[in-house]
Curated annotation (Swiss-Prot):
One of its GO terms (molecular function) is cyclic pyranopterin monophosphate synthase activity. Catalyzes the conversion of (8S)-3',8-cyclo-7,8-dihydroguanosine 5'-triphosphate to cyclic pyranopterin monophosphate (cPMP). The lineage of its organism: Bacteria, Pseudomonadati, Thermodesulfobacteriota, Desulfovibrionia, Desulfovibrionales. One of its GO terms (biological process) is Mo-molybdopterin cofactor biosynthetic process. Pathway: Cofactor biosynthesis; molybdopterin biosynthesis. Keywords: Lyase, Molybdenum cofactor biosynthesis. It holds the Pfam family MoaC. This is Cyclic pyranopterin monophosphate synthase. InterPro entries: MoaC, MoaC_bact/euk, MoaC_sf, MoCo_biosynth_MoaA/MoaC, Mopterin_CF_biosynth-C_dom. It comes from Nitratidesulfovibrio vulgaris (strain ATCC 29579 / DSM 644 / CCUG 34227 / NCIMB 8303 / VKM B-1760 / Hildenborough) (Desulfovibrio vulgaris). The gene is moaC. PANTHER family: MOLYBDOPTERIN COFACTOR SYNTHESIS PROTEIN A (PTHR22960). It catalyses: (8S)-3',8-cyclo-7,8-dihydroguanosine 5'-triphosphate = cyclic pyranopterin phosphate + diphosphate. Homohexamer; trimer of dimers. Belongs to the MoaC family.
Length: 161
């Protein structure tokens, strides 16, 4: 059997493979991802007053993000299905510049991390905001989606600066 390359999901000859985590001891793991959805002041006003045609944007985006976290292994080919113990998406509505900052947090006790679940939760929540606001604004921007915190596992704790 060939040794693994530097990328954990690739064999020496370049074939993709799912990492075997069966030998790892379960540990408590957390990942937090942040993103920003930039909208116009007019769109933000409609969002704050729950006056957009599709309804309550932030509640819908929260539910969509949590649902997406639970289905990450169905979307990312080499991602392990996990028993998620906690998932949440939080929002901060900002007037200047007009935007919605969001933070997705996912936790588990398991043999692999939840970074992908948090990324998919944040991206899906952001895309849901876009979907629910696109009737009134087409040039919405989703930006700065990134891992800001991760704990647990062999690599330990990571905090973005």
């Amino acid at each position: 059997m060939k040794e693994r390359a530097a990328f954990s999901h690739m064999t020496e000859d370049g074939a993709v493979t799912m990492v075997d985590v069966g030998h790892k001891n379960p540990t408590q793991r957390t990942a937090i991802v942040r993103a920003v959805v930039e909208v116009s002041a007019a769109t933000l006003d409609l969002l704050k007053h729950r006056a957009l045609p599709k309804g309550d944007v932030l509640t819908t985006a929260k539910i969509a993000g949590i649902m997406a976290a639970k289905r990450t292994a169905e979307l990312i080919p080499m991602c392990h299905p996990l028993a998620i113990s906690y998932a949440d998406v939080r929002f901060e509505v900002r007037d200047t510049p007009p935007s919605i900052a969001l933070e997705a947090e996912v936790r588990t006790t398991g043999q692999t991390g939840v970074e992908m679940e948090a990324l998919i939760a944040a991206q899906t929540a952001a895309a849901t905001i876009y979907d629910m606001c696109k009737a009134v604004q087409k040039d919405i921007v989703i930006r700065d989606c990134r891992l800001v915190f991760k704990s647990g596992g062999k690599s330990g704790t990571f905090r973005a600066e």
